[in-house]
Amino acid sequence: MKKSISKFILVLLFLLLFSTQCEDDIPPFTQETEQQELAALKTEIENLANTSFCGDAFECKFIAFGSKPCGGPWGYLVYSTSIDTEELENRVERYNREEAIYNTEWGITSDCAVNNPPVSMNCENNACVAVY
C-alpha cells in the first residue's frame, strides 16, 4: 500500500512539474528584430570595407551585396585587398543568404531592376572607386 501511494505521489509530482514548465526565455523573432539584425550585419560589412585602401600593393575589387526579392543584388560593395578579403566575402555571403531568407519569410517585394556591376575600378586618393 505504501509503495502504491509513493508511486502515486511521484507520478503526481512529475505531472505537476511538467505542467508548470516555463516557456523558452527566447522571444520569437519578429520582422523588426530580423530587420535590425540584418542592418547591424550590413553596417559591420560596410565598416570593414571602408577600412580598405588601395595603392601599388593592393588590388581593388567588388562583390555583389544584398539580395533583392526578385533576384540579384541590391548593389556592389567596393573594397581592396588591403583587408581580410576572406572575412569580408564570408560576411557578405552570410548577409546575402540571410536577406534572401528574410525576403521570402516576410513576403518582401521590390522593383526588379537589374543593377549592373562596375565596368572597372579606379584607385583615387588611396580609395577604390567603381566606374559604371
Predicted features and spans:
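Bacterial Sec-dependent N-terminal signal peptides
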Residues: 16-39
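First exposed extracellular module after export/assembly in secreted or surface-exposed proteins
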Residues: 2-3, 31-132
